Every structure is written in structure tokens, then in C-alpha cells.
């Protein structure tokens, strides 16, 4: 029977994860005005996501459909490598002008996935449930692939308060930088160890075409300052992260970040603790249709994270 009262759609998503990086850096100076550095980064990724999408009959009438739901579980883990190159020029003792290039990050990722579909068709078939694990001997389906993130180019300028040779007696600095990221350069490729090379290559070719259509280059702007009290530092900063989407379907990806932190420097050892508060707006679409409109939820983002950095200079 046709639905007279419509369908109620609901999408519940729970996600958690982390991204850490082991950095191996070297730095040097050509003269008193030029400094340079090279960093080898080894990132580690861990992510878990559970999504439940439900469509339910808005009425209580018996029409051979009560609800249908699909619950998906995704676990992603992996590691990779990247390079960062930077140079700082000092036109005057108090000023610093910097340029840096961050290479694409090469990641080898592994997805573990399962899906469970539940339907209640009332008098027709009643309540039925089927899981993808029934086809994988009760295990999560597993698949590995390669992912390349876009490169980044940065330009920065800073002013040092009370510039003297003894850095422990400097009072702080003000800084700003501009970053360019071409998100369209993000791409996925087949893991060379994959057994279904031809079919998978065709899928990733289409996926990369979609990335090229949806994303665009973006500019990120950051401003900040630091005050030094011998070995203790206090910091404040803000960042505006530009929208990476072409807005073909109303996507909004810009974000504003406000940061406060403390730092400790003594005899080559350093500890940095920062709090980052993020706000932004976006949309979420549980599914997309190519030939007709599809539903989207408006999202107001409010997030916070704490970043701890430990290091030693030698």
C-alpha cells in the first residue's frame, strides 16, 4: 500500500579516533640570516565509526512496512610517511620570514567493516535481520588501500619581542601565516598486494574523479602570540580554515579555531600543552542521489581537543 503519512529518517553516528606522528627533524644555518630544516614524519591513524540509518513509517497503520535500518561499523588503522622542508630568513634581528613545503602524506590504511540490515514488514515478512558477517565466517570484512593527502605550502612572518642573542631572555613573539592546500589533489590507489587489481582500479578511478569534482583549493590563515617568562610560555592563537568544498550541494567546510596553551623550555627539553576550541557549520547527507534532490542535515560544529607535545633538542 502507498504511504500516505511519509517516512521518518534518522541517522545516528558515533565516531572516535586519533592521529599521532613521530617526527625526526634536522636543522641548520647557512649564516646568521638564513635557517633551514627538514622533518621526516611518520603518522599513525586509528579511527572507529558506527552509523545507524533508519527509515520508519510515520503512521501506526498496518501497510506492510514499519521500519528498515542499516547499522554499519568501520574501523580504520594504518601508518605512513611524509616530508616537511622549511627555510627562515631574518632581514632584521626582530623579524622572521618563513617558507615551507609539506609533501603529500603517503598512508597505507586497512578498513575493517561490517553491516547489519534489519527490516520490519509487519504482516508481509515480519522482522528480519541479516549481517555481512554471515558471509565472512563471523569476522569483519578487511581491505587495505593507499591514500595520498594533498601537499601544503606555507608562508609566515613573525616579530620577536626583545630580540637578543640569549633566547632565554626574549619576551615572546607575534606571528601570522598563510597556508595553501589543494584538496582536489587527494587520491586513493590500489594496494599492490590486492588480489582484484582491475576491478578495484576502476572503482578508485571513479572515486578520484568525484574528489576532483567536489573539492577545491583552500587558504588557511593563522595568527598567534607568545609571552615568555624565563622557562614558562603562555600562548594565544586563532586559525581560520577555508572551505575545501565547491558547494555543489551546499557543503560548508570552513572552521574557526581558538587556541590557548602553556609551554616549558629548559636545557634542551620542551613540553607544550594546548587547548583548541573549534566551531563551524556543515551539512550531512546519509545518501546522495545523482538525478534528484536528497535530504541533508544542517550541522553546527562545536569541538575541543587537547594537544600534548614532548621533545628534546640535541
Which positions does each model-derived feature cover?
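Outer-membrane beta-barrel porins/channels
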Residues: 1-314
Amino acid at each position: 500500500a502507498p504511504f500516505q503519512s511519509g517516512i521518518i529518517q534518522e541517522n545516528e553516528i558515533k565516531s572516535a579516533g586519533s592521529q599521532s606522528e613521530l617526527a625526526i627533524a634536522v636543522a641548520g644555518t647557512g649564516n646568521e640570516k638564513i635557517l633551514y630544516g627538514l622533518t621526516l614524519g611518520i603518522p599513525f591513524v586509528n579511527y572507529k565509526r558506527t552509523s545507524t540509518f533508519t527509515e520508519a513509517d510515520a503512521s501506526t497503520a498496518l501497510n506492510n512496512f514499519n521500519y528498515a535500518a542499516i547499522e554499519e561499523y568501520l574501523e580504520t588503522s594504518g601508518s605512513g610517511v611524509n616530508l616537511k622542508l622549511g627555510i627562515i630568513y631574518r632581514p632584521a634581528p626582530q623579524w622572521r620570514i618563513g617558507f615551507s613545503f609539506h609533501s603529500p602524506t603517503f598512508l597505507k590504511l586497512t578498513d575493517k567493516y561490517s553491516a547489519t540490515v534489519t527490516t520490519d514488514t509487519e504482516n508481509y515478512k515480519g522482522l528480519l535481520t541479516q549481517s555481512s558477517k554471515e558471509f565472512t565466517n563471523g569476522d569483519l570484512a578487511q581491505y587495505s588501500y593507499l591514500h595520498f593527502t594533498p601537499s601544503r605550502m606555507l608562508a609566515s612572518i613573525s616579530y620577536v619581542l626583545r630580540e637578543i642573542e640569549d633566547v632565554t631572555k626574549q619576551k615572546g613573539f607575534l606571528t601570522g601565516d598563510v597556508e595553501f592546500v589543494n584538496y582536489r589533489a587527494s587520491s586513493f590507489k590500489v594496494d599492490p598486494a590486492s588480489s582484484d587489481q582491475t576491478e578495484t582500479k576502476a572503482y578508485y578511478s571513479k572515486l578520484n574523479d568525484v574528489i576532483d569534482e567536489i573539492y577545491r583549493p583552500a587558504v588557511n590563515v593563522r595568527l598567534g602570540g607568545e609571552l615568555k617568562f624565563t622557562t614558562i610560555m603562555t600562548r594565544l592563537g586563532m586559525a581560520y580554515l577555508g572551505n575545501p568544498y565547491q558547494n555543489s550541494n551546499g557543503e560548508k567546510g570552513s572552521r574557526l579555531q581558538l587556541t590557548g596553551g602553556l609551554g616549558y623550555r629548559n636545557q634542551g627539553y620542551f613540553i607544550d600543552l594546548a587547548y583548541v576550541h573549534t566551531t563551524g557549520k556543515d551539512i550531512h547527507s546519509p545518501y546522495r542521489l545523482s538525478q534528484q534532490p536528497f535530504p541533508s542535515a544542517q550541522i553546527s560544529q562545536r569541538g575541543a581537543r587537547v594537544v600534548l607535545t614532548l621533545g628534546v633538542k640535541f
